[in-house]
Amino acid sequence: MSITDVLSADDIAAALQECRDPDTFEPQKFFQTSGLSKMSANQVKDVFRFIDNDQSGYLDEEELKFFLQKFESGARELTESETKSLMAAADNDGDGKIGAEEFQEMVHS
């Protein structure tokens, strides 16, 4: 699966442009601009599986660091503060990782 199978390349490019500089990544803005927030719960879970590098069923901080690169290979890494903020926004049960349900809830919040 390619991310452009489910999201428009133009929308992805626009979303990445908005957070090009370090410490400018805002999850909800990214989800809206990329079109992710308009997708069904099942489609969001498909994107989650694409982002889940090790197919563990969870996203940890290391995977989140490379979140933008899953949308475009040349994109920047998230900063440590952006990574921690993204984790805090989605990790509802406080276990230090984001499951598919938590990810879907964050995207649609």
From Swiss-Prot:
Modified residues (N-acetylserine): S2
GO molecular function per UniProt: calcium ion binding
InterPro entries from the UniProt entry: EF-hand-dom_pair, EF_Hand_1_Ca_BS, EF_hand_dom, Parvalbumin
Calcium keyword on record: yes
Function: Has some calmodulin-like activity with respect to enzyme activation and growth regulation. Binds two calcium ions.
Keywords, alphabetical: Acetylation, Calcium, Metal-binding, Repeat
Any Pfam family: EF-hand_7
EF-hand domain sequence ranges: 39-74, 78-109
Residues that coordinate or bind Ca(2+) 2: D91, D93, D95, K97, E102
Protein known as: Oncomodulin-1
Organismal lineage: Eukaryota, Metazoa, Chordata, Craniata, Vertebrata
UniProt superkingdom: Eukaryota
Binding site for Ca(2+) 1: D52, D54, S56, Y58, E63
